[in-house]
Amino acid sequence: MRALPTLDSLARMRPPLGDPRAAEDTLTPRPANKSAVERLAADRAKYVRSTLGSSRGPVSEHRVPEAPGVQHRNPIPSALAPAPVARRAIARKPLRPDSLVIYRQKCEFVRGSDADCSRVGLMKKFFQGSGKDKMAVAPETTRVADEDKTTKETEATWTKSSQAAAARPASMLPPPTPVVAVKSPAEKTRVANEDKTTKETEATWTKSSQAAAARPASMLPPPTPVVAVKSPAEKTRVANEDKTTKETEATWTKSSQAAATRPASMLPPPTPVVAVKSPALPFEVAPRVPVGCSGVQLRVSRSKGLQRSQSDLSSRYSIAKAESDTFFKYCGLDPDVVEALGRENFSAGSDCVTLKVRSVSMAASDSSFSRHSEDGLQEEELLEQVPSTTSVVERNARIIKWLFTCKKAKETPSQKLQGPA
């Protein structure tokens, strides 16, 4: 597709009527009209500085030469002749190697065992860069090659020396060079002082052992006792434990001596300890037993190796038995009650004790107890009864039953109390 000529150009191209050569000019073939791109390329030399245009001359000079016998009156067709287009030279990058070259280089890299193949980068070897990149990489490659060469030479030297040492006998081998550790002056001084002190100590021990071996055993000094160094807190604790142990031993000794000197009848009755578990259970009457040492004191006495004699143990058991007998003799009553009733009234063969106990306890109770009750025994009938001897177990059982009845009557005042059966 080409541009159509304008009316002005057609009028100029039309030859005059009186010209005899107009028909010839009209019949001769004329060059095609230039397109807009061709006209722009022809006018480019006017406003673009190009090395190519300057070397070849202006673009307007490149015109199609006319025939010598043909003369054109109109200069426009010659100006419309196509002119060569000046193009700028573009620097292209080097092309990448084809796949075959890459494959060959990869095979050489894998097959080669030298350090050069392992040191050089695979990417730098495959893809060629510009001249500047090659110049920048060249010193590094040279340094790596030098290091590899030095390493190979060192390994070869060591291999030769080891083979030569293995080939010749041991008698021809040179003596090993001693390894001397370099020490600082302060370290040397400290080591010298330690060596000097060690030598002096050894000399002193040697002299003392020789002197001890030379003189007889009678002249030898007594051995120095080894004293364990204790802290102040440890000393205080041990002193307190010793003091407590001594006080406990003195107390036991005095009590055993006093119990051995006076008879069992003069021993004071123990105070019963009553522990109420629940309203449905009776009182638990327990005799007063001498309180023993605490756990710490027992451990201290055991650690000290304290041993009781046979007489001490027998006195302790006799005291416990005497107190138990006293408890059952006075029916577990308090000492003031026993004094009020009179100690002479408590005898093993008397049944009047039950009556006395009944009368005293009922006077102190808050219950509505009447002496003349229909369910229980009357006081006159008790006095008329003939005393009979009862066992200790039976008497204690009656007393415990009676105490339980008193407790229930105290809780429920409507219930009537009875004396011990």
From Swiss-Prot:
Modified residues (Phosphoserine): S350
Subcellular location: Cytoplasm, Cytoskeleton; Cytoplasm, Cytoskeleton, Microtubule organizing center, Centrosome; Cytoplasm, Cytoskeleton, Spindle pole; Nucleus
Alphabetically ordered keywords of this record: Cytoplasm, Cytoskeleton, Microtubule, Nucleus, Phosphoprotein
GO molecular function: alpha-tubulin binding
Pfam family, one: FAM110_C
Chain intervals with Basic and acidic residues compositional bias: 143-155, 185-202, 232-249
Chief place where the protein resides: cytoplasm
Keyword Cytoplasm applies: yes
Disulphide bridges: none
Subunit (UniProt): Interacts with AKT1; the interaction is transient and follows AKT1 activation. Interacts with PPP2CA and alpha-tubulin.
Membership in a protein family: Belongs to the FAM110 family.
Record's protein name: Protein FAM110C
Source organism per UniProt: Mus musculus
